[in-house]
Amino acid sequence: MPYIYMNITLAFVISLIGTLMYRSHLMSSLLCLEGMLLSLFTLNALLSLNMNFTLSTMVPLILLVFAACEAAVGLALLVMISNTYGLDYVQNLNLLQC
């Protein structure tokens, strides 16, 4: 396994561990989730370039679109929670239910 793939996989695992460890604050969870998506995008782009298959070049772009949508929804939730409660705890998400 080349070192670049091992480094990208290690970045994904570190972001996953960060998501599992620091899930009390919404901002840290969103940052770790973005790190996971960035490493997935990089790995996907490298693999699609190495495969030389023209249809596989669309997959990283689709993943990037989903990452942008996830970031927008996450930031909207963060702004709504911080304006309502003044804190960004994940526990406050349970208070948003009707």
Swiss-Prot record:
It is an enzyme of class 7 (translocase). It holds the Pfam family Oxidored_q2. Its main location: mitochondrion. InterPro entries: NADH_UbQ_OxRdtase_chain4L/K, NUOK/Mnh_C1-like. One of its GO terms (cellular component) is respiratory chain complex I. Its EC number is 7.1.1.2. Signal peptide: none annotated. Keywords: Electron transport, Membrane, Mitochondrion, Mitochondrion inner membrane, NAD, Respiratory chain, Translocase, Transmembrane, Transmembrane helix, Transport, Ubiquinone. It is a multi-pass membrane protein. Disulfide bonds: none annotated. GO terms for biological process: ATP synthesis coupled electron transport. Core subunit of the mitochondrial membrane respiratory chain NADH dehydrogenase (Complex I) which catalyzes electron transfer from NADH through the respiratory chain, using ubiquinone as an electron acceptor. Part of the enzyme membrane arm which is embedded in the lipid bilayer and involved in proton translocation. This is NADH-ubiquinone oxidoreductase chain 4L. The lineage of its organism: Eukaryota, Metazoa, Chordata, Craniata, Vertebrata.
